[in-house]
Amino acid sequence: MDFKQEVLDVLAEVCQDDIVKENPDIEIFEEGLLDSFGTVELLLAIENRFDILVPITEFDRDVWNTPNNIVNQLSELK
């Protein structure tokens, strides 16, 4: 399984919705798929699954707003 698919799987688990896989350009915050608690859960899941630490202070909703953008940000950090 490639990195993008793995990230989308984690995101779908946290959001409890497969739409993030079907439409990787969906605005996850605007659509109510992720909130502040979900953000923390996502960052912990990313750290546990990929061993990538993303400090909450580095998580900007305007940058991490779509599944594709999340994959891109994590690709830069890994």
UniProtKB/Swiss-Prot annotation:
Keywords: Cell wall biogenesis/degradation, Cytoplasm, Phosphopantetheine, Phosphoprotein. 4'-phosphopantetheine is transferred from CoA to a specific serine of apo-DCP. InterPro entries: ACP-like_sf, DltC, PP-bd_ACP. Its main location: cytoplasm. Pfam families: PP-binding. GO terms for cellular component: cytoplasm. It comes from the Bacteria. It is found in: Cytoplasm. One of its GO terms (molecular function) is D-alanyl carrier activity. NCBIfam families: dltC, PRK05087.1. This is D-alanyl carrier protein. The gene is dltC.
